[in-house]
Design a protein with these regions (language model features):
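Exposed, low-structure sequence patches enriched in small/polar residues
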Residues: 1-174
Length: 174
């Protein structure tokens, strides 16, 4: 990971690499399975006390699997943005958005987006009460995909997402 700060702006890049090789026998036949996953991320964010803070990032993942006669390769491209803003010293607005494109070597399998937002109110720093309304899954995304691998299998999983909903929260500090 490499990180650099320029005044109130912080930039970072990071890479995660994982290589696994499994040598096994299945019904007296040798099977050599290799998995190589790579995740690269670039991020740019601000760090202000009173101005809105923004976090922009881009994540690119490659999941390369070779199970003897079968091989698969999955890609995930995911730009995202987060905003955190203090408004009139009493309201805090937070929102986050991410776009995900999950594909294999031939085509895109699924694209999905997530967008969440919240608005909270606290009269002042000494106030015991805080009120918040939160909206989750504003774009009403229905499912997301992930790929995983082990020593004997590669799987591509589709998970179903809870529909859009709103919550209201009251918080009291003792």
């Amino acid at each position: 990971r490499y990180q650099r700060t320029f005044g109130k702006l912080r930039a970072s890049v990071r890479a995660n690499l994982n290589y696994s090789k499994f040598n096994q026998f299945i019904q007296n036949r040798q099977s050599v399975n290799e998995n190589f996953s790579q995740t690269y991320r670039a991020q740019l964010r601000t760090n202000f006390k009173t101005a809105p803070n923004v976090d922009l990032s881009y994540r690119y993942t490659i999941q390369d699997n070779n199970l003897g006669a079968n091989s698969t390769k999955f890609f995930t491209k995911s730009p995202s943005v987060e905003v955190d803003a203090l408004i009139f010293k009493t309201f805090t607005f937070r929102t986050d958005y991410s776009y995900n494109d999950f594909s294999n070597e031939q085509s895109s399998i699924n694209t999905y987006e997530f967008w969440n937002a919240s608005l909270s109110y606290r009269k002042d720093d000494d106030s015991k009460f805080e009120y918040e309304i939160r909206a989750t899954n504003l774009l009403d995304t229905r499912s997301q995909n992930q790929s995983s691998s082990s020593n004997i299998s590669v799987s591509e999983t589709e998970s179903f997402i809870q529909p859009r909903y709103l919550t209201f929260r009251v918080r009291y500090e003792l």
